[in-house]
Amino acid sequence: MRRFEATKNSGLRMLCACLLLFMTGNRTMAEEQMDDLKKRTPMDLSFKQLWKRRFVFDAEIPFPKDVTFLPCGHFAADVTSLPAEIQLVTKSGDVKMCIEAPVDVQPPYTMHAAFGGKARVGLFVTKDGVTRLNKLVPLPDGFDPREKSYTTDLVMRGAGGAGDVKCSLSAGMGQADVRFVTRGRENTLYWEDGRIFFTFSVRACGAEGVASFDPAKLDVRLEGIILFDYGDGKLRNDVACHLFHDEEAGEWRAFVSNFSTGGDGLGNGLNGRAEGGLNSAWCKENPLHGLSVMKAKSLGLKGLMHEDPSGIWDPEAKKWRLFLCTFVKGIKAQMLESDNWDGPYEPLTEIVPEDSTGTTIQWMNGVRYCFFGSAEHALYVYSYPLLKKLGKLKLDVEPWGDTPLETPWGVMKTTNSRVWPCFAELPDGYPYKYILLTMDRINIPGMPNPNWTYGGLYIYGAN
C-alpha cells in the first residue's frame, strides 16, 4: 500500500474531525473527537496481524571469498558425495577443526555450519528445500573461535565431496528478542531512508542481528551483525540489546545482555555469566550495516542476574532509567535508575508479580508506557516509571496457543507466550498509526534440550 493511501484507514477519524471543524465551524465537536484520540492508551488498540515470516538461512549478506573466518559466521557447502567435511585451517596449515558432513543423509544436499561464539557449532542440512538440524558439534579443547587473530588466520575450506565454502552474515534459522533501534535519549524511532530498524537475536548463529523495514511495505531485510569487544582479545556474540543513537554524546550506545560470558568464568552469575548479566556498549560509527564491533564493559550490577534491558534518559527526573528483567522469584520486570548511562544503577521499583520477558519502554500520545511479554499468555502494559499495572495488548491472532502456525517444518503450535512486545507509534502517512513487532517461540523439531532455536517474526498494525 502506498503511503498516500494511509487516510483510508489510519487517519480516518482524525480526518473526519478536521473536516467537521472546517465545514461546520463546530469546534467543540471536532476538538472532542481529536481529544478522544489523544486520550487513547495501548490497551484501547486492537492489533491486526499484517505479516509473518521465519527466515531459515535465506536472509544473508555474502562475504567475499578472500574473507577467512567470522566468529558469527554462517558457512555453507554443497555436498555431492561422502565422505565430506568443512575444515578450519590456519594459514600455516594447522587444522583447528573438522566438521564432518552427515552420513545419515543421502547427497546431494547443502550442509550449514553456524557458529555461536564459545559454544557448540550447529550443523544443519538443507535437502529438498527443507532445513533441519542434524547435530551439535562440540568445539575442540583449547579452540575458541572468538579470538580476534582467527579472523585473519583461519581459512574455511571444503574437503572430500564438499564444494567451496561460502561465508555470510546470516539472520540464521530463527529470529527472536526483537527491539526497535531508537534515536536520541528519549526512545523515539530511528529512521534511515524511510526505514525503521530493529535488533534481534540470530538463532543458531548466536549473534546480535540488525534488520529494517519500510512500515508501508513490510519488506523486512537483514542489514548487519554486531559483535562486542570487551578488550580481552575476543569478538563476542552477545544478544538481547537496546541499541540507540545518542546524538548528544556523539556516539551509538547499547544496553546488552552478556550471554557470551556463559562458561567463561568471568563471574558467579547464572550459568557462569558475568555478574549482573548486563553490559554497556558504544561506538562512533553507525553499527547498523554489515559487520560492526562495539566496545563493551560490565554495567556493574551487583548480586542478582538481569536481562532484556531497555534504557532511556528522563529529562524531568534527570536520571537514566533502565527497564529490565530481574532473576528473583523467577524472572520479573523491574525499573532501575542512575545518574550516568553506564551506571551504577539502583532499584527505583520492586519487581512486578508476573513472569516477564522483553521489557520495553515506548511512547504513545506523548506518554511513556512499559511493555513486557509473559508466560501468562499476555503482553502486559504498565505505567512508567513506577510500574503500576494498566492492562494488556489485544492481538487478533496471538503467536501462541491454539492458533496453528505455518513453519518450514509443517504446521505447528506452541503454548509458550514469552515473546517480546516491540511497540512503536508511527508518524502520519502510514497505513497504521501503531505497529507491533514480535516473535513466536517455536523450536526446530528434533533439537536437543535445552535449546534456543525459536523465532518467527510477526508484524501487527493498529489505528
Regions found by a protein language model. Name each.
Residues M1-G11:
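N-terminal secretory signal peptides that target proteins for export/translocation
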Residues N26-M29:
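Sec/Tat signal peptide C-region and signal peptidase I cleavage site
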Residues C16-M23:
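Bacterial N-terminal signal peptides
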Residues E31-N463:
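Carbohydrate-active catalytic/glycan-binding domains of CAZyme proteins
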